[in-house]
Regions:
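Formylglycine-dependent sulfatase
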Residues: 1-186
Length: 186
């Protein structure tokens, strides 16, 4: 099937995907094509997708930080390059990989397409423990939304400050999920 990344790659763009992946390599599919088969030169995903990934550790207030929970621990079978980090910092991990990807392509005068798919606002919500507040779904949602906004802000600041990108970059923002009962509405 045609993909935007594959089209751009064939037309000279460097392509990178950093974030959620739902196009093969799911929790129960160990033989899906790698993300590169969809047109991406570089990728870093979360629990799904073949290849390098950030896997989430979870903490609740009062939980022993030496014994965090693990979401989808068996996802390690889907590829090498697994790094574990707090769920509340996964988008930061994606942004911290996306910026060097852009820097490398800029240095080589290479046009690029960057796919950044954070999923912070997908339940269950795992903000930093200091941001749990009353623990209500609405509070947790707001906390993960604010954390995601901070990371997107870091990415946008990089684009704004870079002379080759400022005024020459198209940014599209879409949400991972629709309304979540109990999380509030805009």
């Amino acid at each position: 099937a045609p993909t935007l990344a594959r089209f751009l790659q064939k037309n000279g763009y460097a392509t990178g995907h950093f974030g959620k992946w739902h196009m093969g390599g799911q929790r129960n599919v160990a033989d899906a094509p790698p993300i590169s088969a969809y047109g991406f030169d570089q990728s870093l995903t979360n629990f799904e997708g073949m290849g390098p990934k950030l896997l989430p550790l979870t903490l609740k207030p009062g939980q022993n930080p030496e014994k965090p929970g693990r979401i989808w621990a068996d996802a390690t079978r889907l590829g090498n390059g697994v790094r574990w980090m707090q769920r509340s910092h996964i988008t930061e991990g994606f942004v911290n990989e996306a910026i060097p990807f852009m820097e490398k392509e800029i240095a080589g005068n290479q046009p690029f397409y960057l796919n950044l798919w954070p999923d912070d606002v997908h339940s269950p919500f795992w903000p930093p423990t200091v941001k749990w507040g009353d623990g209500s779904k609405r509070r947790l949602y707001l906390s993960v939304l604010e954390a995601m906004d901070q990371q997107l802000g870091k990415l946008f600041a990089f684009v704004r400050k870079h002379p080759k990108l400022s005024g020459n970059t198209l940014i599209m923002v879409c949400s991972d999920n629709g309304p979540e009962k109990g999380a509030g509405v805009a």
